[in-house]
Design a protein with these regions (language model features):
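Iron-sulfur cluster-binding electron-transfer modules in prokaryotic oxidoreductases
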Residues: 1-262
Length: 262
């Protein structure tokens, strides 16, 4: 896999515009380092796609300084290395505080499990994952055109804990006339990075997924956690990618729509 997004985020901001709304975008470690799989259904890494979608909605994208050294600490916490996890969380908080001009602008992280931990350790800023940010801030800045292509949606454990299950489903319904949430499929079993070393956990947790996908005829699924999407892709027979890709496919900026109607 290859990730060509580094050049886009090397600076502190993208497309400076003094009159635009601003958002601080912190791409998760996994989305900074992992590119697209060999047979990906999408053409851009998520970081690139998030930038273009935010700009479509009229936002100036700001990045924290030394972003490639920042981490929310989730991976360290999962290994029991709590001191390192807390230190990384503190470093991230300081960088986001500066980038957001002391909490003036919202913070977006593109991985729901990372955002969940950030909300547990950072209280003085407004933090969002993709589905909630898009639904809250971009919905009125974009023109949605529903596709008749049926799509599957996986609700991550962290989304359920944050009370955002309905948000990602509602967002998907703005994009597609047929949104399918498989029954009896809760936790995907990837469990952070354990799915890489214990794939049987992942396959057992998702044992009821593939039959439902095959029966429905759905060919693509959406979620908001890269590791979950890896396991879902492996065990469903269809690719799963970030919900941001679906939104981008089904939207135009309000400005572009107005121009088209002239």
């Amino acid at each position: 896999m290859q990730n060509d997004s580094a050049a886009l985020v090397a600076g502190s901001s993208v497309a400076r515009n003094s009159t635009a709304d601003k958002v601080v975008y912190f791409p998760s470690c996994i989305n900074q380092t992992m590119g697209l799989p060999k047979h990906s259904p999408v053409e851009q890494p998520l970081v690139n796609k998030m930038i273009s979608l935010l700009q479509k909605g009229g936002y100036e994208v700001i990045f924290p300084k030394e972003m490639d050294k920042l981490c929310c600490g989730t991976i360290w916490e999962s290994k029991g290395m709590l001191d390192i996890a807390d230190r990384k969380a503190a470093e991230l908080e300081a960088a986001l505080w500066e980038a957001s001009e002391q909490g003036k602008y919202p913070i977006l992280c593109d991985q729901s499990p990372c955002l969940h931990r950030m909300r547990e350790t950072i209280q003085k800023m407004k933090l969002y994952e993709p589905a909630e940010f898009i639904y809250t801030f971009l919905r009125d800045k974009l023109v949605f055109t529903q596709t008749d292509r049926p799509v599957a949606v996986h609700i991550t454990c962290s989304m359920r804990r944050m009370g955002l299950a309905d948000t990602i489903v509602s967002l998907a319904k703005l994009c597609s006339t047929h949104v399918f949430v498989p029954e009896e499929v809760g936790c995907c079993g990837f469990a952070g990075d354990r799915g890489f070393t214990y794939p049987e956990l992942n396959s057992y947790a998702l044992r009821k997924l593939r039959p439902q996908i095959e029966a429905s005829g759905i060919t693509i699924g959406y979620s908001n956690s890269r590791t979950c999407e890896i396991g879902l892709t492996t065990n469903s027979g269809i690719p799963y990618v970030s919900i941001a890709y679906l939104v981008d496919q089904c939207t135009k900026s309000v400005k572009a729509e107005a121009t088209d109607n002239l």
